């Protein structure tokens, strides 16, 4: 009897997952077998994660997993304003230097995060009311932090979370004092500080192509680019609820229409971490030519800011979830091609008997 297509697909999946089971512990896996290497094999720049001194010096499995599985790192907190310039003109780079040294030592691409953000902002900044003062403070902060790592970082999130849910600019000290011109000031200063770094605007809830927030992002970025503001990329944080991965493709495609060189998924975590949701997001990036990579926002669930939702690729025991192994397949098309190859092979043998 000739097996039907469902039986063939099931056989293919068994073979695929058997291969994953034999691949060895993820903390000791060779880089050539990593999820990052497989992502790069599909033409992308990286599949990364986050780190900081605290997490790197916590559970020893965290740095081991990062070294073996991810090709890019973003700092979770060490490059934010309250960490780098807690008092005016007094810069502290202890945490960020530790992070950068770890990333460089282990050959990881680095994304800087973040220069201008309304949150984790020292009160001495948020209390400024004078345009000239705030402009000078912004320029000095951006220039000093970026020059500390000039030539070492692939990209920077220059401005972060500047939109409300209706697509208008968020109320912050920057927008209140400078209006939307703070965006131009930030990006022009960043370009001068490190001309080689890719400069991003980054935000959350950009997960539906039809949402007012996403549409507001696209329209503003188009306008700013037309005015000469040097925005190279849009970062979609992609903090998702369960079942929301299916909309990722449409959302990334919509963001890509804004006219930037790049888009990226910058802070991925998904409630429940189902393989379906993670594969949907991976495929969304693979299918969008401007999407350069994905950064997962944490290694294992205990370290996540959403720990109670189990949103990451590694569980509380630092073991890989099904979503990690399935994501290694990288795309439905890749898996479907394997189904077809296996099916054709079996059918040809059956017909030749």
UniProtKB/Swiss-Prot annotation:
Its EC number is 3.2.1.8. One of its GO terms (cellular component) is extracellular region. It holds the Pfam family Glyco_hydro_10. Residues 50-330 form the GH10 domain. Residues 1-23 form the signal peptide. The active site is at residues 161, 267. One of its GO terms (biological process) is xylan catabolic process. Its main location: secreted. It catalyses: Endohydrolysis of (1->4)-beta-D-xylosidic linkages in xylans. The N-terminus is blocked. GO terms for molecular function: endo-1,4-beta-xylanase activity. It is found in: Secreted. Belongs to the glycosyl hydrolase 10 (cellulase F) family. Hydrolyzes oat spelt and birchwood xylan randomly, yielding xylose and xylobiose as major end products. Monomer. This is Endo-1,4-beta-xylanase. It comes from Penicillium chrysogenum. The lineage of its organism: Eukaryota, Fungi, Dikarya, Ascomycota, Pezizomycotina. The gene is XYLP.
């Amino acid at each position: 009897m000739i097996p039907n297509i469902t039986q063939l697909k099931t056989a293919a999946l068994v073979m695929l997952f058997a291969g994953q089971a034999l691949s060895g512990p993820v903390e000791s896996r060779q880089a050539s077998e990593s999820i990052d290497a497989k992502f790069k094999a599909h033409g992308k720049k990286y599949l990364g994660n986050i780190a900081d001194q605290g997490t790197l010096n916590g559970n020893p499995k965290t740095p081991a997993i990062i070294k073996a599985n991810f090709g890019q790192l973003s700092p979770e907190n060490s490059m934010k304003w309250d960490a780098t310039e807690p008092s005016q003109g007094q810069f502290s780079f202890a945490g960020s230097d530790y992070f950068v040294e770890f990333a460089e030592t282990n050959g990881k691409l680095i994304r800087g995060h973040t220069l201008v953000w309304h949150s984790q902002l020292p009160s001495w900044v948020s209390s400024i009311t004078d345009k000239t003062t705030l402009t000078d403070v912004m320029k000095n902060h951006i220039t000093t932090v970026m020059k500390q790592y000039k030539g070492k970082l692939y990209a920077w999130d220059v401005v972060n979370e500047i939109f409300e849910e209706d697509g208008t600019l968020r109320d912050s000290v920057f927008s209140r004092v400078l209006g939307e011109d703070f965006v131009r000031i930030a990006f022009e200063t960043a370009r001068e500080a490190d001309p080689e770094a890719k400069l991003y605007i980054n935000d959350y809830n950009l997960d539906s192509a039809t949402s007012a927030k996403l549409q507001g992002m696209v329209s503003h970025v188009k306008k700013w680019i037309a005015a000469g503001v040097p925005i190279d990329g849009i970062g979609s944080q992609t903090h998702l609820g369960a079942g929301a991965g299916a909309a990722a493709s449409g959302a990334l495609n919509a963001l890509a229409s804004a006219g930037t060189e790049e888009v990226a998924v910058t802070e991925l975590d998904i409630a429940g971490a189902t393989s379906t949701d993670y594969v949907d997001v991976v495929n969304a990036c693979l299918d969008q030519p401007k999407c350069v990579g994905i950064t997962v926002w944490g290694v294992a669930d205990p370290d996540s800011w959403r720990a109670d939702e189990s949103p990451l690729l590694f569980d509380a025991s630092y073991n890989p979830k099904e979503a990690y192994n399935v994501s290694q397949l990288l795309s439905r098309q890749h898996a479907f091609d394997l189904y077809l190859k296996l099916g054709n092979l079996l059918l040809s043998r059956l017909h030749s008997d």
